[in-house]
Amino acid sequence: SLLSIVLLLSVQLIAQSVPSPKSHFGFNIGDNYKLTTFTATEAYLKKVEASSNKVKLVTIGKTEEGRNHYMMVVSSPENIKQLQKYKSISQKLARAEGLSDEDAKQLADDGKAVVWIDGGLHATEVVGIHQWIETMYQIITRQDEETKNILKNTIILFVHANPDGQELVSNWYMRNTDTLKRSTAALPRLYQKYIGHDNNRDFFMMNMSESKNMSRQQYIEWMPQILYNHHQTGPAGTVVAGPPYRDPFNYVYSPLLITSLDAMGAAMSSRLNAEQKPGYTMKGGSVYSTWWNGGLRTTAYYHNIVGILTEIIGSPTPMNIPLVPQRLIPNSGLPFPIAPQKWYFKNSIDYSISLNYAVLNYAAR
């Protein structure tokens, strides 16, 4: 019918009107030897907000160097119109004050799963903020049924974890016109004004403004049910380390928190395997656990938030996956080993998008 054609065209126009990363930054996210600054990212976020009814750009505070600290809320247009309602439901469920089991079940039915996805906390781990930009763009513009279902049933909090660090590291890397000399090494100063890499040790005391900004969203404003904290790098001979984490787990947590984390890990590793993306290691295949409890992800466990950490390889300067003989034999910690090979930034971006989609697909069900 004519109406169907008009609706289809309008959907296509909406997708086309959201600027692609390449149209804004001048290169595709994941291109070799290319990083983007926070200044350019901030301008991109504003363009996306102006062109899409699936987003709400929120300034959650200022950074220590005085930049705006952003969170992009992404969901269906219908949900975006009712964010306060869904935030209130998430708060009530998290605090559980005066709720009967029946009340809680009704709220869970009425609400939407709230999922936090961040990027860039450790600014030299440059996959983080770049996968964040590309995932956001794809979630907003893709028209497949999975994406539509995710937007309908979840509210995604895309949180920039370190604007100051992105500006410093990207400018430092891109300063050389000779691409072969580009490197994030030997930064002239800390990539968080006062504590640098230890910005992920600040979430139990919140001395830094960025930690306060993010913790306010985590524990007062939104209380996400799932929190995905992106890091680098993966163990040698693999691509990415993620949940389930190694034993022993922190036994003060609810068993349901641990099994939910393990289920999330199963969804993530299975998706990569189904997409023929080998190299996901878990359990005893990495050193990561649930025991360090002052970080962005691990502090969340004390609030019964399913906190996910992945550590992935990758750099805009192409690299090699080395030969590690003990990593070539499949086992429960590495069911699908990866052979030694050349590795590109785009590979890591693609893996990260798959992992984000696995988490969001799980949350939407």
Show which residues each predicted segment covers:
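Bacterial Sec-dependent N-terminal signal peptides
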Residues: 1-20
